[in-house]
């Protein structure tokens, strides 16, 4: 492996209180374990570079911002004083995969002569920087230059922007399969979503993303050629450059089924700042063991702290969902569909199986109003009262546009009226769909909606949007879509002898990348399962690619404080022992341990809630034999309730084995995953 170390200039001096002299041109900060080192040079331009245990992760990559204030052009300015320190801290989060999050890092604070600060952090598992504007007057951000420069043409996992709404370049669903290709093969005319993974030598992964986004657009990237010449480097590499959606000036109703607000005119700037503001973090997560990505807390650490003083009313849980199964229930004496009897039935199913919620998806109201265009076949008051009696909350679907009216930044009155009305009725939350943008207006609107919902004790599930840090500030936002989830199986085409897309491979890629940014509403739980040769897309009677236990393992593997049961009550009742198992799995945890895994190949993870452990493994279409090391268990004997792929699962995907056995911390379980398969267990201490 080519190793390249960067050193501080001999001229650098350290002053009292951790301040460095302004005459220094280079500054270095290290992670607590010393493996991650960030070098910032501040000469003709400001650049950062990152190494991991001597390996070059990022070549010098420019940091720049272009501002305009009262017609005057401003920039980053020249670096003056620099403060350096090590920070050790932690915080609690009861709505996450672990109850306590460590936040230990090395920090540089670099102050410039144009009221800007560059904050740099080095963590044991990555590095990040952000710009902080000290300007108190209204300021336009014309552009921000954020680069991620790599010294070679490395392989990458790239989620491209696609499915643009009404042809608008920056209006899309944030859903994408991963193109696995060299950086040089990236489409230079296309934008990519982050997180995006770059595969470095010796198995090291560098994952590019943003974090802590607020009142600012989200980050996409595009590829560029990198040519560097100088004393330290003579290489031709590849570069990822940040791209931000320009600020919308005009917009109209359009997009999918006219549910979007689509910008028709954008400004020549990306953001408006109305005072001092910290801009989002530019992040590279670094791991040499893929499994560690599944337990990386970078997005949580760099997010704004919780802003809800009393969170005791927030109730994570599982939810029975109607849309994927097309309300196809049987053995009843009424016509199923968007009507009161159907949802009374869903409430009964949820109550019997100890599910906290049901969702009433699109169709309970009109597309233009949540207040005046109500479906006469739905008696909401009756459903709410019945749900209250049964201990089941109701979540309603809404488009983003329905909740905010026609003005993303002026919709507070609309959303407050709607949310107060339905909260007073007894509704527990909204699934907010078709954001399909992350420009500054939409990010600001997402925060406004979350704050409004919190005031009325409502939970939220954001669709058409990826997580960007808001979920820590407002934990009443349970979930985000922005994932190629189970819904895609309804329209997945066949090509040749199988489906067009390799869904099982995506299922063991997204947890490493998409889930790194935050929870994902994949909506698992298909009870109709198929191998490649027998799978086909079907809207009314959908199925999943891979085995039954592949689906069951998702409930432990995929993070979602609000986790869907996507199939119909009929299917779940026909497979009651699978349903009983799924219903026992929590949606938030006290501890997470990653046991094994390989990006795009398989996952093996353990999570603890109280004294009970939940363990799961998933694979792509490649069958695998793995060992589950149970040394994480405490002393004594435990009882393991296990679902494993059946002997014939490679032919009949619904085939499974249900095993109960005694285990202890000294055991290593040999498990077999069938093609597209899974394995999952609940392990409880003997009493």
Q: Which residues does each PLM region occupy?
A:
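Bacterial Sec-dependent N-terminal signal peptides
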Residues: 1-26
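N-terminal accessory beta-strand-rich subdomains and adjacent acidic, glycine-rich linkers
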Residues: 26-302, 306
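Edge strands and adjacent loops of beta-rich recognition modules
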Residues: 96-102, 581-605
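An acidic-aromatic substrate-binding cleft motif
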Residues: 270, 274-353, 357
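Aromatic- and carboxylate-enriched substrate-binding clefts and catalytic-loop regions
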Residues: 360-543, 547
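Catalytic cores of secreted or luminal carbohydrate-active enzymes
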Residues: 549, 553-595
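Carbohydrate-binding surface patches
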Residues: 599-635, 679-680
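C-terminal beta-strand-rich structural cap/linker in extracellular carbohydrate-active enzymes
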Residues: 661-687
């Amino acid at each position: 492996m080519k190793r390249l170390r960067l050193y501080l200039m001999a001229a650098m001096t350290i002053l009292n209180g951790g301040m460095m002299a302004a005459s220094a041109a280079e500054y270095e900060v290290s992670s607590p374990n010393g493996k991650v080192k960030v070098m910032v040079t501040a000469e003709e331009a400001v650049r950062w570079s990152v190494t991991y245990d001597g390996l070059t992760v990022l070549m010098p990559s420019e940091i720049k911002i272009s501002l305009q204030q009262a017609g005057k052009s401003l920039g980053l300015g020249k670096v003056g004083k620099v403060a350096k320190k090590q920070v050790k801290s932690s915080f609690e989060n009861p709505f996450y995969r672990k109850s306590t999050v460590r936040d230990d890092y090395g920090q540089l604070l670099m102050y410039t002569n144009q009221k800007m600060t560059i904050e740099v952090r080095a963590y044991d598992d990555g590095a990040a920087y952000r710009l902080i504007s000290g300007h108190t007057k209204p300021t336009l951000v014309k552009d921000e230059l954020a680069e991620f420069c790599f010294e070679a043409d490395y392989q990458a996992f790239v989620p491209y922007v696609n499915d643009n709404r009404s042809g608008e370049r920056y209006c899309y669903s944030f859903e994408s399969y991963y193109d696995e290709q060299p950086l040089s093969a990236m489409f230079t005319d296309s934008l990519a979503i982050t997180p995006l993974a770059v595969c470095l030598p010796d198995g090291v992964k560098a994952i590019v993303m943003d974090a802590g986004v607020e009142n600012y657009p989200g980050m996409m990237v595009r590829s560029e050629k990198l040519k560097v010449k100088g004393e330290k480097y003579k290489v031709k590499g590849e570069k990822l450059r940040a791209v931000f959606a320009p600020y919308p000036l005009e917009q109209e109703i359009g997009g999918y089924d006219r549910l979007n607000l689509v910008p028709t005119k954008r400004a020549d700037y990306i953001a408006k700042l109305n005072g001092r503001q910290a801009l989002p973090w530019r992040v590279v997560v670094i791991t040499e063991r893929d499994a560690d990505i599944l337990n990386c807390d970078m997005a949580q650490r760099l997010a704004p702290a919780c802003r809800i003083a009393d969170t005791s009313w927030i109730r994570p849980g599982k939810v029975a969902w109607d849309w994927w199964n097309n309300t196809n229930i049987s053995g009843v004496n009424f016509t199923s569909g968007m009507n009161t009897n159907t949802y009374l039935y869903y409430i009964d199913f949820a109550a019997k199986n100890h599910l906290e919620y049901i969702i009433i998806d699109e169709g309970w109201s009109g597309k233009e109003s949540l207040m005046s265009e109500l479906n006469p076949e739905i008696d909401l008051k009756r459903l709410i009262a019945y749900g209250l009696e049964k201990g089941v909350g109701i979540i309603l679907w809404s488009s983003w546009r329905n909740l905010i009216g026609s003005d993303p930044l002026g919709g507070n009155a609309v959303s407050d009226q709607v949310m107060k009305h339905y909260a007073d009725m007894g509704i527990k939350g909204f699934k907010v769909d078709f954001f399909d943008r992350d420009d500054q207006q939409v990010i600001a609107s997402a925060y406004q909606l979350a704050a409004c919902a919190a005031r009325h004790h409502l939970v939220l599930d954001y669709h058409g949007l990826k997580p960007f840090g808001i979920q820590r500030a407002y934990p009443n936002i349970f979930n985000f879509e922005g994932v190629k989830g189970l819904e895609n199986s309804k329209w997945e085409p066949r090509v040749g002898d199988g489906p067009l897309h390799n869904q099982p491979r995506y299922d063991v890629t997204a947890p490493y990348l998409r889930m790194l940014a935050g929870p994902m509403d994949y909506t698992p739980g298909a009870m109709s399962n198929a191998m490649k040769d027998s799978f086909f897309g079907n809207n009314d009677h959908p199925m999943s690619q891979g085995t039954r236990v592949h689906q069951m393992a998702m409930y432990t593997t995929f993070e979602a404080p609000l986790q869907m049961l996507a199939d119909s009550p009929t299917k779940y009742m026909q497979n009651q022992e699978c349903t009983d198992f799924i219903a026992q799995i929590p949606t938030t945890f006290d501890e997470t341990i990653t046991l094994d895994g390989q990006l795009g190949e398989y996952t093996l993870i353990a999570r603890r809630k109280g004294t009970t452990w939940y363990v799961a493994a998933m694979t792509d279409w490649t069958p695998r034999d793995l060992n589950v090391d149970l040394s994480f268990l405490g002393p004594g004997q435990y009882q393991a309730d296990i679902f494993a792929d059946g002997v014939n699962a490679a032919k009949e995907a619904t085939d499974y084995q249900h095993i109960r056995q005694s285990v202890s911390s000294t055991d290593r379980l040999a498990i077999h995953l069938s093609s597209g398969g899974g394995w999952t267990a609940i392990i409880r201490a003997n009493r």
